[in-house]
Amino acid sequence: MVREVSASGRSVVVGVLRNRREAIVSACARHRVARLEVFGSALRDDFTSEESDVDLLVEFEPMQPYARVEAYFGLLDELRHLLNREVDLVMVGAIKNPYIARDIERTKQLFYAA
């Protein structure tokens, strides 16, 4: 679960995620998500509730490539609607820069696991 913090706008994201948890979990199940994790500014002091997007790392259950494309964009649309803000949805394995991948791996927080 995403940790709660009281300082800065990060608590806004935690609150929005918590308030929409049931709907987000339903969307994850519908789109065959294996894991959904939060990373980036939503977990740092530089998050601003007015401008920052929410960075999410997603791993889908095994499926055919075309089905994965549909699942990805379907989930992305639902998350943007549910969170009422921009969402950067990054698939596990898509980050090729080892420094960025290591930073995401080090800081990510689990939100959903099937």
PLM segments and residue spans:
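Catalytic core of pol beta-like nucleotidyltransferases
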Residues: 1-37, 43-50, 61-114
